[in-house]
């Protein structure tokens, strides 16, 4: 799993995460694909680090929307998408 993979899966979520549009089905599909491809602890930590890094570099991200995204898509992930998340603690 690479940050490129994460970015590809999450690209359709950007407008929603900026509060600039509705939640597209493609975004939830990306969230589900990402969860399904992160099968090991290392993959989950990589995905976490990539998500946190991307959320800091994309301007205008609403972290409330980001944190709620997995639940809105019906997916459970073992960490919060937040700048303060310590990805090294993800199992």
Curated annotation (Swiss-Prot):
Disulfide bond recorded as keyword: yes
Database matches in SUPFAM superfamilies: Bifunctional inhibitor/lipid-transfer protein/seed storage 2S albumin
Record-linked InterPro entries: Bifun_inhib/LTP/seed_sf, Bifunc_inhib/LTP/seed_store, Plant_nsLTP
Gene Ontology annotations for the cellular component aspect, listed alphabetically: extracellular region
Presence of keyword Lyase: no
Cysteine pairings via disulfide bonds: 3-50, 13-27, 28-73, 48-87
Pfam family, one: Tryp_alpha_amyl
Recorded GO MF terms: lipid binding
Coarse class of the protein's main subcellular location: secreted
Coiled-coil stretches noted in the UniProt entry, renumbered to this chain: none
Location in the cell: Secreted
Family stated for the protein in its record: Belongs to the plant LTP family.
Role played: Plant non-specific lipid-transfer proteins transfer phospholipids as well as galactolipids across membranes. May play a role in wax or cutin deposition in the cell walls of expanding epidermal cells and certain secretory tissues.
Name of this chain's protein: Non-specific lipid-transfer protein P3
């Amino acid at each position: 799993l690479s940050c490129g993979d994460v970015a590809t899966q999450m690209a359709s979520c950007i407008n929603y995460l900026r509060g600039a549009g509705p939640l597209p089905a493609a975004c939830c599909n990306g969230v589900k694909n990402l969860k399904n491809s992160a099968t090991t602890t290392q993959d989950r930590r990589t995905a976490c680090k990539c998500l946190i890094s991307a959320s800091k570099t994309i301007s205008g991200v609403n972290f409330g929307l980001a944190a709620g995204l997995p639940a809105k898509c019906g997916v459970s992930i073992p960490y919060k998408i937040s700048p303060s998340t310590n990805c090294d603690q993800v199992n």
